[in-house]
Amino acid sequence: SHLSHFHLVFEDNLVCTYDEIDKRYHARPIICGSPSIISIPSIIEGPAKPKGYYFKQMLKDLLSISSKEIENEFASTFISYDDPRLTQVATGYVIQAIFFFLTNGNPFCSQYPCRLFNSHWQEELIYTQVKNPVLCKEHLQLLAQAGK
């Protein structure tokens, strides 16, 4: 289908959806539709930080370390507020919103490390959006066809 325009909202509140299966809310960095919504706090809070981060947070009193020390130790492994990488990550979500319309409803790719990969971990997000922000062969072809 031909995409002449689409509507996109950047949200500064956490955006969540309720999962009927596990009966809990999940932060969603992007909800595609009309309009598509990209939530900056959900980019930061949604995808999980490394397991070691949570492990140390649980044991910080036992280990005699502060939350700030743990944050500093793991800073390169997750996106935080005022993070210079946040713009690149948000751009990746804009690309996903565009592909939602180009594919008639499928903004994600199951092939890691495509930029459209649905990252559930911060480290995946950083790799696919900052360190290696490229589309897989299939999505590059789809993009080329859309431009014709």
Predicted segment positions?
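N-terminal low-structure segments adjacent to metalloprotease catalytic domains
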Residues: 1-28, 78
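Metalloprotease/metallohydrolase-associated module, dominated by Zn2+-dependent proteases
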Residues: 26-85, 102-148
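ATP/nucleotide-binding catalytic cores
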Residues: 82-100
